[in-house]
From Swiss-Prot:
Alphabetical UniProt keywords: Metal-binding, Metal-thiolate cluster
Task performed by this protein: Metallothioneins have a high content of cysteine residues that bind various heavy metals.
Any one of the GO BP annotations: cellular detoxification
Record PANTHER family: METALLOTHIONEIN-LIKE PROTEIN 3 (PTHR33357:SF3)
Source organism, top-level taxon: Eukaryota
UniProt family annotation: Belongs to the metallothionein superfamily. Type 15 family.
Protein name (record): Metallothionein-like protein type 3
Length: 65
């Protein structure tokens, strides 16, 4: 499935966001404290089933529609 991005076909593959969880966990260690930062990075206007970059027009993407 090298020509698909999640559940959608993208004309420009470089605009596709890697399929997987939209949550990123970064663990930052310092001398005095340990901090865990969890960021929610939702893809635009979908329910997480399809992730495409903002410049990617996925014509047959079913992003929860």
């Amino acid at each position: 499935m090298s020509d698909t991005c999640g559940n959608c076909d993208c004309a420009d593959k470089t605009q596709c966001v890697k399929k997987g969880s939209s949550y990123t966990a970064d663990i930052i260690e310092t001398e005095k404290s340990i901090m865990t930062v969890v960021m929610d990075a939702p893809a635009a206007e979908n329910d997480g089933k399809c992730k495409c970059g903002p410049s990617c027009s996925c014509t047959n993407c079913t992003c929860g529609h």
